[in-house]
């Protein structure tokens, strides 16, 4: 694969969620990713688009032969990604110490929800659980309603795979000077906590409260929210700065002199009611056209099925069509070492073929 990580060798122990997502991004950026799957888990691989840009092999890691083959592969790798509960790879004979014996330059990347240590480290959980303990889930939703799960973007991917990737790349950079590998302990509860650092800082200065839906960036401010249009669809409004707010009012045909002051919190309900009435007067596409070339920070809220028709998305080739559906292209983009369009998930190959290739 073309890309800035061309030549990097990655072994991925089969898992779900953020580990495979991190491996996918490494593959998108040119790394040679080999996924070791269980022999009984290969059904449905062609339907999992997250397994793009991989070579897939199978091995029974509980057998002596499977363990031996896996260690041979790891001995030639730069990075190992695993997402099991703490202690599982050690019991398999593939823990950090065992792998370091065959490859002391290996970056051993561990992805868990709770981390390798702590009282919850052996406890099951999902994205919603990890972000429930660090304040994030409590902060998302309307003030008069229960907290709303933000899909599984914040814990699994924002706080999980993204920070796993940061750890891998940082450890690879450090290896250039030390010549040694190390363990990367990436926990979703830790990474997602860093994502919300801005809110902690605002809270420390009195600019954020624990009351959900009452703050500037959580839908509390009427100029940072979504509004329903005449056709039942929605627009997103992010008109925070005065000049953007003024542009929004101009597009709506409203006079600031006749409205409550933008940042008078006591009159936010009144301002919200006026904006709600204005946006409800026309359909979403009308407002999309009105604000298409303005700095009002007003955009249509598109469903998945509409995204690939958005002119900006089309112009940037943000998505490509594959197997009857749409998939995102690799990101970010590089001026000299551009990534190519991803390969679809491949059929399994013999692990010996990869070993021979990596011997070259």
UniProtKB/Swiss-Prot annotation:
Listed name of the protein: Alpha-methylacyl-CoA racemase
Record-stated family: Belongs to the CoA-transferase III family.
EC numbers for this chain: 5.1.99.4
Gene3D superfamilies: 3.30.60.110, Crotonobetainyl-coa:carnitine coa-transferase, domain 1 (3.40.50.10540), formyl-coa transferase, domain 3 (3.30.1540.10)
InterPro entries documented for this protein: CoA-transferase_III (IPR050509), CoA-Trfase_fam_III (IPR003673), CoA-Trfase_III_dom3_sf (IPR044855), CoA-Trfase_III_dom_1_sf (IPR023606)
Quaternary structure annotation from Swiss-Prot or TrEMBL: Homodimer.
Industrial or biotech use: Development of gem-disubstituted substrate-product analogs as inhibitors of racemases and epimerases is elaborated using alpha-methylacyl-CoA racemase from Mycobacterium tuberculosis as a model enzyme. These non-physiologic substrates could be used as a therapeutic agent to inhibit human AMACR, which is overexpressed in prostate cancer.
Activity control, per UniProt: Inactivated by N,N-dialkylcarbamoyl-CoA substrate-product analogs.
Keyword Iron assigned: no
Chain positions recorded as substrate binding sites: 38, 59-62, 83-85, 91, 125-130
MF term (GO), any: alpha-methylacyl-CoA racemase activity
Keyword terms, alphabetized: Isomerase, Lipid metabolism
Result for mutant: residue 82 to A: 12.5% of wild-type activity
Pfam families given in the database record: CoA_transf_3
Variant or mutagenesis effect after changing residue 56 to P: 28.8% of wild-type activity
Catalytic activity from the UniProt record: a (2S)-2-methylacyl-CoA = a (2R)-2-methylacyl-CoA; (2S)-2-methyltetradecanoyl-CoA = (2R)-2-methyltetradecanoyl-CoA; (2R)-pristanoyl-CoA = (2S)-pristanoyl-CoA; (25S)-3-oxocholest-4-en-26-oyl-CoA = (25R)-3-oxocholest-4-en-26-oyl-CoA
Known function: Catalyzes the epimerization of (2R)- and (2S)-methylacyl-coenzyme A (CoA) thioesters. Accepts as substrates a wide range of alpha-methylacyl-CoAs, including (2R)-2-methylmyristoyl-CoA and (2S)-2-methylmyristoyl-CoA, (2R)-pristanoyl-CoA and (2S)-pristanoyl-CoA, and the cholesterol esters (25R)-3-oxo-cholest-4-en-26-oyl-CoA and (25S)-3-oxo-cholest-4-en-26-oyl-CoA. Can also catalyze the interconversion of the non-physiologic substrates (2R)-ibuprofenoyl-CoA and (2S)-ibuprofenoyl-CoA, which are potential competitive inhibitors of the enzyme.
UniProt record, GO biological process: acyl-CoA metabolic process; lipid metabolic process
Organism: Mycobacterium tuberculosis (strain ATCC 25618 / H37Rv)
Phenotype upon changing residue 126 to A: 4.5% of wild-type activity
Domain of life: Bacteria
UniProt miscellaneous comment: Interconversion is achieved via a planar enolate intermediate.
Residues forming the catalytic site: 126, 156
